[in-house]
């Protein structure tokens, strides 16, 4: 392996093909047909409590009770909507990556690369990302509390969402981070260790479905964002192979555990940062070890289904056809037509359905109401039930 890719020496990036890991079991324990990407809208009372807690006006115990109440409501919402697998709504986080920043010492929360998000009307907002400024040190588990709380509240299948090493590569800046890590590789090596340990801990606690969130893969499609990587000491062409290697190292080999990879193009208050079809990054489908790919496909920004030809025959594609950014409710008949169109490239039995992304990747949430969110989750569940029936248990080869 070239020295530039020697971040984790036990993972080999293999050639493409129908399945580039033919000696590794890639059979899901259950093929869930209706899936939720992760985040749900935070209720107003939780946002107010978060502000009070930050101002020192609310105790840890009082704030935790309020978070718990919001999670209980998220659980009930998803189960009543008919979703086959649920999350805690990510309501304990200030953003989808907040579990990393709050649990690991070494980041300046808002001191990093400011990414412009925009919408079809040209309206923009800027999100200031974290930046690593000192050596990483894990203060507490990243996701364990989230999972164990849901596990204790319901017997319904639940998954946990985690940031990818690839996503967190954007938190390195060759100027601001140099005092902590001379190279991005040194930073990422520590990060991979932390994320890999968290995966092992989640599995020890009984989690059987772990989703890795990696919207930065699609950033590699955008010329402006690629240049942003270069300016911060990160070669975007090298980063694709390195990211695949890192994400494979994080999830490791755990028979009986389902791993999903979510790809989107940014999701912040109904705005996005990138566009383009999946064609240039289909290596992610072929060379990673994920069982499920949760892909944004709600509008023309995502391109057509043709790149799905590159998905190995033993993986599941979760089609994100229902927008979490816009309030208008999609037509069930139109969803079924799009599922049929996708089945020309991936067999119907290897497809599933979800919203295109979370409803609140940041604490502010998207421009949809709680009623919109519920209707869209119900639409996903009902459409999946009508197309596929109930989720299918499969034998898992160990």
Where are the regions that the model predicts?
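Extreme N-terminal basic, low-complexity initiation segments
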Residues: 2-10
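Domain-level signal for soluble alpha/beta catalytic cores
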Residues: 3, 25-398
């Amino acid at each position: 392996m070239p020295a530039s890719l020697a971040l984790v020496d036990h993972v080999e990036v293999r050639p493409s093909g129908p399945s580039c890991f033919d000696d590794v079991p890639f059979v899901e324990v259950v093929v869930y047909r209706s899936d939720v990407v992760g985040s749900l809208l935070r209720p107003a009372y939780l946002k107010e409590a978060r502000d009070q807690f930050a101002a020192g006006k609310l105790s840890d115990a009082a704030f935790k009770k309020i978070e718990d109440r919001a999670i209980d409501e998220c659980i009930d919402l998803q189960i009543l909507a008919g979703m086959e697998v649920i999350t805690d709504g990510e309501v304990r986080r200030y953003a989808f990556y907040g579990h990393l920043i709050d649990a690991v010492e070494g980041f300046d929360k808002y001191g990093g690369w400011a990414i412009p998000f925009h919408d079809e009307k040209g309206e923009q907002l800027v999100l200031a990302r974290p930046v690593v400024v000192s050596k990483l040190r894990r203060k507490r588990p990243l996701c364990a509390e989230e999972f164990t709380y849901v596990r204790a509240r319901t017997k319904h299948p639940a998954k946990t969402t985690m940031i990818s090493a690839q996503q967190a590569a954007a938190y390195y800046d060759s100027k601001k981070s140099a005092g902590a890590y001379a190279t991005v590789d040194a930073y990422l090596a520590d990060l991979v260790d932390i994320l890999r340990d968290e995966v092992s801990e989640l599995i020890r606690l009984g989690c059987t479905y772990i989703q890795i969130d990696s919207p930065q893969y699609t950033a590699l499609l955008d010329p402006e964002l690629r240049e942003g990587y270069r300016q911060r000491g990160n070669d975007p062409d090298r980063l694709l192979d390195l990211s695949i290697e890192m994400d494979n190292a994080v999830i490791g080999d755990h028979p009986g555990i389902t791993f999903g990879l979510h790809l989107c193009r940014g999701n912040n208050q109904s705005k996005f940062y990138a566009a383009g079809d999946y064609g240039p990054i289909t290596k992610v489908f072929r060379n990673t070890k994920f069982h499920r790919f949760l892909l944004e496909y709600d509008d023309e920004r995502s391109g057509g289904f043709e790149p799905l030809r590159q998905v190995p025959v033993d993986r599941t594609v979760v089609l994100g056809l229902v927008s979490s950014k816009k309030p208008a409710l999609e037509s069930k008949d139109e969803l079924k037509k799009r599922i049929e169109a996708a089945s020309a490239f991936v067999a119907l039995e290897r497809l599933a359905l979800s919203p295109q992304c979370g409803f609140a990747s940041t604490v502010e949430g998207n421009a949809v109401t709680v009623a919109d969110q519920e209707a869209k989750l119900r639409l996903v569940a009902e459409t999946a039930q009508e197309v596929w029936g109930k989720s299918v248990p499969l034998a898992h080869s160990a």
